[in-house]
Amino acid sequence: MNYFKYFIFVVFLFFTIVKCEQLLGEIEISNKNFAIDASVVDTKINYILDDTIKTPKLIITSIKGDATNINDIITVSEDKSTVTFGDFTELSSSNKLVGFNWISMLIASLLSIGLFATTTTTNKKSSIIILIIGFICLSLMINGIQSISLSDVSVKIEIRVPSNYQFESFKLKLNSGSSNIVGLIANSIEIDSCSMVKDHSITIGQLVVFSSLKVCSSLDIKITNLGLSPSNTIAELKTTRNIDLQFSNGFSGSISIDSPSVTLDPGCTTTISGQTTTGTCNGGSSSKLSISAGNSAIVRNLEITCPIDNSWRVTPASSGPSTNSPSIFTTQPATNFNYGKSNLVFMAQWNNVSLLDGPVENSFNITYVTWSPNSHWLVSKDPSPTLKSGVNYEFSLELLLGQPLGEYTSISNVSIYFFNPKDITNPNGNSRYFQYSNKPPLYMKTFSGANFISNSNFIKTSITFSPTKDIGSAVFALQINRTAALTGPSEISISIKDMKITIPSKSITTPSNILSKDSELLTLPRPSTLLDPQDSSSCTYKQTDLVHWHNPSTWASGFVPLPSSNIILPEGKRVLISPCSISQTEVYKKITIPPTSELVFSDSPMTINVQDIYVQGKLTMGTNTCRYNANINVIFHGNKTTTDTIAQYFGSKGIAVASGGFISVQGKQYHNTWTKLSTTAWTGDYVIYVQDSINWEVGQQVLITTSVYRDESDNQNEVMTIAAIQGKVIQFTKPLRYYHYGGQEYQAEVALLSRRIVFRGDGNGQEQTDSQSFGGHVLVNGEGQFSGIQLIRMGQTNIKARYPLHYHLAGTVKNSYISDCSVTNSYYRCYTIHGTNNVSLVRNVAFDIRGHCYYLEDGVEVDNNIWFNFASYVHPIGKPAGGPSQTGEIFQQSDSLTQPADSAAGCYYITNAYNSLVGNAASGGWSGFAFPNLDKPIGNHRTISIIPSQFPLKEFTGNTAHSSGYYFEEGGSIYVGGNLTFNEATQLLTYNSGRFSRSTYFNGTKKDGNERWMRFNNTKIYLSNRGIQHWGERVEVVGLESHDSIRPSTLFGQAWLSNAIVNGQSGNIVSNQGRNRQGFQFYDTYVQTILSNINFRNFIKDPDSENPESDNRVIISMTHSDVFKPQGISATKQITLTNVASSQVIGHRVVETGSSRYFNFIDWDTSLVPGRTAVGAPTLVGSHQNWWQYDATCSYNNDWLCWVCDKGDKEIASISVLVPGLIESGYTNQEEDSYVGTASLFGNGITNRRSTNITRNAGITGVSNMGWYLWFSTGTPTSINIWVAQVIKNNYLFVAIPYPANTEFSIRCAYRWNNKFNYNFVLANSASEVRNGNGTRYYFDQTHLFIKAVNLALTGNEYFERGGAKVYNVFWEFNIYIEASNKNVQPVNGFYTGIPDTLPSGNL
């Protein structure tokens, strides 16, 4: 125990002595003849280019030893040419202090040990001896601390120099350690690590030597990218080990190599004598290379591949494919879909069993606990392959019993099932309880036999099955049934191997159902079929005034700049880069192109690794008439930073083009860049057929988009590689995993992702770039032309202005475009227009994008052309925006969500609608096309005095969107809504994804006569939630095809939908997952909606629907509210129905709300409600209440739960009866059952009650030119205000209200906005006189007050008309005020109570 205590004290003493790394000091290098003599110390030397300094310097840090001050171990010569490490006996004051501290610590520690020993040891004599020995040791240490032993010292030396700094001479004399020297430039260099016979590893890169290079080491010597002056340079390398030397651009001179193993690249003529190799390289010169290597010598890149003659050009790349396509194969091989532990889950009625690895490859094991159920399921977590009816498929597995066959191990049979996903427990959910509905499976088959009996060998069992109908979206399950009721008292197991479904091989023949057009109704615009004309004589790289990058004379320094330096092109020169000009592996730190300079790339395959390129002048890598055919890779390097390393405000890791600069990067044109299937592609297919001519190539990557609704949670987009291509037929290297629809209704898009010119971030899915989501970026503040580029892993997540391709604050440009490019796997957006106008984005594609893709940033961007582009698989950043009903969800700007609208990331994000969008397609995303509301510009344009949301669409024609809108209940594939604001106080953006309305005007200027409609022309929507979701005041949708969407559109304000096909169910077998489809839902208040010339088709009854609104109906009522009540706001005309049963035409849900009671619309030509006697005449449809049964033409439809009547001379009328303290104006949100009376029809021969309830929420809607009897259960109010909201010109309401006898009245009409329409009612002689009058008289028959409600302020032009149908305006603030008084009857709290509910005469 005592020894353990001593040990603890020794450990304590050790840790008090050990020191950490310590900076000793810095030394400025002012002499270009510089040497370091470190022959007596261990050194770790790093040569670093540092452009933050102007004068070279040494930074010396102690790693080990006693030194704490640079002067203790270093002397510097007076001329500062030599730094020498030495062993000095006189210490600096600081080291003396350290010595004193050490002594003090040692005394304290030894005294503690002595004290400890004397108090814990019974042998006092031995304790005293211990203490004496300690003091002797202390005395020796005190004597020794007067000097430092440099053999125990290790230092780190950083030699920091500015880029392109050149030494006259540079010498290192080294002891043990290591040196990493990159970017050293000198006339002569000498590195000696041999003299001290110590091991010092040496790595050298990017070395430039003009006169002499000498390197000697006892370890390996490795030098990469060595540049020697072409004449009079001597290089001597010596080691007892190995030498690996690589020249940057060859070597010209004599060589002498002494080594038992020599490897030389081509370029030299040599002779060998013993182990000595001598000769000349590249014609020889006065330069000499001498190598002595004890083991081996390797010399690379000896040949001079880059001549410096200005007329020399590398051979340009060919425009032809790198590989000629083989023929499309005639027989497609069979395809297996394998199942195993990773994609199956055990499910049963009880017990939770995990699948474990099996005994052999491709096998898994199931161990049943005691008394498990006799039946269980193996359910696939992946969608099943789609299966064609009538095709023979094979299911097979190999099974091994874990125990001998017995009572509890016997398997009676196995069944395969295909279930509708909604009918069973979700295999990807948390529950393992297998439950399915009473609906039959899509398909099942049982098989049994003797192959389930072996516990010694796997025995294969297979069955052939042939579905009787096509199976689309399905879950595959395998049911295993045992003979015994339970598994018994002991655990048992089985193993399954090679479980799979096999799709048989088939012959490849041209299908008979190839499409000749992509739409039935619409003509979607397509780009020109012509390729851009090319003229090879115009190629910039052929021009004669170019100078070569690799020619030392190009550079003022006389040498080719090193990759690790900040490279600035010489002013006024046009510099040509060829593949041999640059290192293909080293990372170039920064290249700057001054305003008068140009950097031109050759049209030849090359790779340039770079951190930053700053273009103040011009960068040319192809032009519009000379598009490059070479495979050129530009790889951007760098870890995440917010420091501006390119230039101020321009970020890091990319290309920035300054104002006044110009960039042109234009690769081979592939056309079309995207197309569509011309027939459906099935699971297992290798071959697809497309609609358009294409010039794609073998080896390129192709995307086929999803044909399902939710592409984010069920990603069925597939990236394939072309194996063969002939015309419009493409064969892939592997079979398709999913089904991709290509019917007449719509077709999956097929997009080319590959390009010959590639910009990419340096990550590969595993490196730091990917984990930091920090790729490269291209920013253009001047003019820029880009075509034929693929950008991979570009963009920098949540860093503003760091996007793959980005026009940044360039104003109105004259000649800028991005054409036929591809952005894939982007960390932040795809194509951005920011503070820039007149840009063209044409024929581009994008796939797998984080945040908004095509992105117009601040709300000031106008007059841009966005034509024929494609975007797919776009991901919201963070939590996707959801929220209840119309309110949406609010997101605040944060470090993890710099642009809060990225919570609703769309394929196209348009902050100012005054741009041209033609022929684009959007697959996936929160929405396909997003038009957020901005009351002010944001970002750099907050002071611009416009209202972006007031600008109408400049052009929106022929665009397509699908597989989107599902994150939010009210989300749409085209979403005009949401609100983005900037808070001046917090300096943060806020985004609300919900309902925000916009009103649009000419030039964005609000004034009378400037009103403009948001117009969507020839639009196709499919697999969508709301299709077009428009929250605004004015919208026209003309030309629409909607297929397999929950609802084709939700349109607010004055809205017209015309010339459309609305298809509830297409032929896509993976789209029908039991979702409710609605043709159109009429809104419940204050809008004007007209539907005209629409074909509704394939709305099929759902026997399991909960109510009519969820039963695949064509027209749906909105019935959720008593606060919001419809006026006469909806109309239809020229409606046709195809494959729609009569029961499915209208879906009206009967609930006790005003919106349910007052549901109505006008069918202006009886086309939607056929079977009327007055064929072609207008028909009025009203809700379930007989309040709408106004004449003998009315009939009740039991399927629709609505009254249908000939309209005749009637119109929809609406008033608000306002009573102080009972029914107030506005949205008072009273309860739905807050009944205060009834409104009943009277007159016109009506004698029975045809009524509707009045609640405390204002508003009654019914039929005009009828008698409306208003009765209040609380008693008749003494004061009533009737707002005549919608009684159109030449129409009226004959209103009756009961009062006690002898009541007197003061009745007046007032129009808030023009008092010339104000008047007082006068007493008439009869009720009929009132009804037949002009609306200025009243009559009281001692039971009922009669007035005629008309609106004399109307001109007759108060309506919205489109497509031959009208919807009349709501007219604001035209009111009739009734004041009643009675000398005989006193009101109670303003009400005359106890008044009988007596219906006026039916003869009135």
From Swiss-Prot:
Alphabetic keyword roster: Glycoprotein, Membrane, Signal, Transmembrane, Transmembrane helix
Positions glycosylated per UniProt: N352, N365, N413, N481, N639, N838, N979, N1003, N1017, N1253, N1334
Domain (G8) ranges: 553-679
Signal peptide: 1-20
InterPro entries, per the entry: CEMIP_beta-hel_dom, G8_domain, G8_domain-comF-like
Family: Belongs to the comF family.
Protein name: G8 domain-containing protein DDB_G0286897
The organism of origin for this protein: Dictyostelium discoideum (Social amoeba)
